[in-house]
């Protein structure tokens, strides 16, 4: 599960997503690349721990990540 406390920057957020979701080495570390990777292989469900911490660090980018996950059909739970 992604840990929002580790997402202190956009780069750190994409590192965390890559680690947790097992994204490929060519993952471009942005919202479009995340959407592309989720088309090929997506988890059924993700629990995003400490979403509030990510939101404080990332602002609207945290909501953007959540939107991409949900648009890809991932059942997202924020905690």
Give the ranges of each region predicted by the language model:
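Positively charged, polar, low-complexity stretches
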Residues: 1-79
């Amino acid at each position: 599960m992604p840990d929002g406390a580790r997402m202190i920057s956009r780069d750190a957020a994409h590192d965390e997503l890559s680690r947790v979701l097992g994204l490929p080495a060519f993952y471009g570390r942005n919202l479009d690349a995340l959407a592309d990777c989720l088309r090929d292989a997506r988890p059924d469900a993700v629990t995003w721990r400490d979403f509030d911490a990510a939101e404080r660090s990332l602002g609207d980018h945290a909501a953007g990540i959540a939107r991409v996950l949900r648009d890809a059909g991932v059942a997202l739970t924020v905690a």
